[in-house]
């Protein structure tokens, strides 16, 4: 990974690792890339509690077939086997990210946790070292985190990363 990061910074092509630590999967178009990502997430059992925190899907953008918003909705449905009910945003077990600093609660932009209970009025989230209740407008400080932007992932570490690079995202693909 370090070797390939150095190559990318130089503008050179990555070298796939035969052992499987680093591999490149080519897609014909955005829909094909989306299908490949979903298949990889199924293969890697992304819905498993432990795997949710070890695996991360990264995309440069929020919009589009391979964007974070569409991927999160699709991964949520894949993991739970159904769409979230009307009036709800999260299922228990969903991987979520805090999107702004909340100094009173000690939760900061980019913190990732797991929903343990959700109602239309409240969302209860377990973080590494605490449990936090979100009520009213605070609920909008959370978003699904099965897929996140490269920007939001900066400073984080993951066991496994699925990184989407598509020509349709060309304006976001600078070294």
Q: Which positions does each model-derived feature cover?
A:
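Conserved flavin/dinucleotide-binding core of flavoenzymes
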Residues: 108
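Conserved helicase motor core of P-loop NTPases
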Residues: 1-105, 116
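C-terminal accessory regions
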Residues: 111-175
């Amino acid at each position: 990974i370090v070797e390939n990061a150095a190559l990318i910074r130089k503008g050179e092509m990555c070298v796939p690792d035969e052992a499987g630590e680093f591999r490149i999967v080519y897609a014909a178009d955005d829909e094909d890339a989306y299908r490949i990502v979903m298949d990889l997430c199924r293969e890697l059992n992304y819905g498993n509690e432990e795997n949710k925190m070890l695996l991360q899907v990264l995309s440069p953008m929020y919009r589009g077939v391979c964007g974070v918003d569409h991927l999160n909705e699709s991964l949520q449905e894949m993991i739970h086997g159904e769409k979230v009910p009307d009036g709800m945003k999260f299922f228990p077990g969903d991987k979520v990210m805090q999107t702004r600093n909340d100094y009173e609660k000690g939760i900061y932009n980019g913190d990732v946790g797991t929903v343990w209970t959700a109602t239309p009025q409240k969302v209860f989230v377990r973080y590494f070292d605490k449990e936090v209740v979100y009520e009213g407008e605070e609920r909008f400080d959370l978003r699904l985190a099965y897929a996140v932007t490269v920007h939001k992932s900066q400073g984080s570490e993951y066991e496994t990363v699925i990184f989407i690079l598509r020509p349709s995202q060309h304006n976001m693909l600078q070294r």
